[in-house]
Amino acid sequence: MMQPSIKPADEGSAGDIIARIGSLTRMLRDSLRELGLDQAIAEAAEAIPDARDRLDYVVQMTAQAAERALNSVEASQPHQDAMEKEAKALTQRWDEWFDNPIELSDARELVTDTRQFLRDVPGHTSFTNAQLLDIMMAQDFQDLTGQVIKRMMDVIQEIERQLLMVLLENIPEQSARPKRENESLLNGPQVDTSKAGVVASQEQVDDLLDSLGF
């Protein structure tokens, strides 16, 4: 059975493809400029197989770290409140004793309460230190989520680079939009679209897309 021959796309179809690629590239460029948030992330996720899972992982890790930190703070608060309350009470009692020395039995009770407070302080501080350590350990999610986010950004940038290469290699010369002299001066150095792989900065990317009419 003979295979049907593949005919080259007509100029109209090629123009539509180039226009769609240009629009997609502009969308990715704007998404990167806005840190890939909101709707841009949802659109980019359509082109990246596991992007949603990666973002969900980042959200889960961030939520877990926040919950651990809040739980540790809530657990430590009663210990801090107890030490503060007891310290203020003992300070007031000692101030009153210095202003008006009390009987020996009352002084002994004051000393006994003070010694008990001092014995309790290490327990409170040890518990609080453990909670502070847990808060610090909860921040290790930043290393993992940072790697995931960096990987996603690398993928998006690579998609953008490949799309730009397609435009540079296949755009017809007559499709480039001519620019007035004043407009060129305002936009600074322009991109040489006759060579592949010459895009080196965000400004050049935007200039290229503008010159192609996207």
From Swiss-Prot:
Broad class of enzyme this protein falls into: hydrolase
GO biological process: archaeal or bacterial-type flagellum-dependent cell motility; chemotaxis; regulation of chemotaxis
Keyword Cytoplasm: yes
Keyword terms of this UniProt record: Chemotaxis, Cytoplasm, Flagellar rotation, Hydrolase, Protein phosphatase
Domain of life of the organism encoding this protein: Bacteria
Compartments in which it is found: Cytoplasm
Site (Enhances dephosphorylation of CheY-P): 147
Ranges for region Disordered: 176-199
This enzyme's EC code(s): 3.1.3.-
SUPFAM superfamilies per record: Chemotaxis phosphatase CheZ (SSF75708)
InterPro entries given in the database record: Chemotax_Pase_CheZ, CheZ_family_phosphatases
Principal subcellular localisation of the protein: cytoplasm
Start-end of Polar residues biased regions: 184-193
GO cellular component terms, semicolon-separated: bacterial-type flagellum; cytoplasm
Classification via Pfam families: CheZ
MF (Gene Ontology): phosphoprotein phosphatase activity
Homology family: Belongs to the CheZ family.
Job of this protein: Plays an important role in bacterial chemotaxis signal transduction pathway by accelerating the dephosphorylation of phosphorylated CheY (CheY-P).
Quaternary assembly: Homodimer.
Protein name (record): Protein phosphatase CheZ
Organism from which the protein derives: Salmonella typhi
